[in-house]
Amino acid sequence: MSDIKYKRVLLKLSGEALAGDQGKGINPPEILKVAEEIKEVHDLGVQIAIVVGGGNMWRGEAGAEIGMERAQADYIGMLGTVMNALALQDSLESVGVPTRVQTAIEMRQVAEPYIRRKAIRHLEKGRIVIFAAGTGSPYFSTDTTAALRASELNAEVILMAKNGVDGIYNADPKVDPTAKKYTKLTHMDIINKGLRVMDTTASSLSMDNNIALVVFNMNNRGNIKKVVEGEEIGTTVEGK
């Protein structure tokens, strides 16, 4: 463990990371690839908590835009994250990684309810914990969930795994070829520059609790391991 920079991490995975090229739904071969990457890091002795998004299933904001009540639309999105969490748990356990799912909305037949002390105990015992159903409340993103859970668990860093984007830019690099990549930023830089990395609530929570953020490209094999070993890839956000 002497060559590991981060001992306890929170990995934020988008729902799209589990969908692969198809963009929607659950893609088992793609999830298995993600699980194998996570296993590499787990085998180093790193304690790993995961927050999964649900954008491959549903987005609450999109539901609200077509006339649904926003709270109801958000609850549907939370259920989507539970499906993703169960699929990821299955893949992780298939490669020999003990995994627990905890949900912010109780559904005891399929997962444990979120209990902070129990989650920490799982991590200490070498189990991965996947947090699903967001915060359990509408209007809060899974990015905010990641910042909240990282704060509660005393995680050292949030690993923000992105699809095909290798860090934070001053413009969308997929649209603007002149977009400039940042290698280091502070949390206030994120807020003041209006950089769309995570929402303001999540950024403020991370800043107030002194949690670093590393944004990197999930599509490059081995990147999660590189980050926890301290290799400077992507963009690191830390300090006020």
Swiss-Prot record:
Its EC number is 2.7.4.22. GO terms for biological process: 'de novo' CTP biosynthetic process; UDP biosynthetic process. GO terms for molecular function: ATP binding; UMP kinase activity. It comes from the Bacteria. Pathway: Pyrimidine metabolism; CTP biosynthesis via de novo pathway; UDP from UMP (UMPK route): step 1/1. Pfam families: AA_kinase. Residues 20-25 are annotated as: Involved in allosteric activation by GTP. ATP binds at residues 12-15, 55, 59, 163, 169, 172. The keyword Cytoplasm applies. UMP binds at residues 54, 74, 135-142. It catalyses: UMP + ATP = UDP + ADP. Belongs to the UMP kinase family. Homohexamer. This is Uridylate kinase. It comes from Ligilactobacillus salivarius (strain UCC118) (Lactobacillus salivarius).
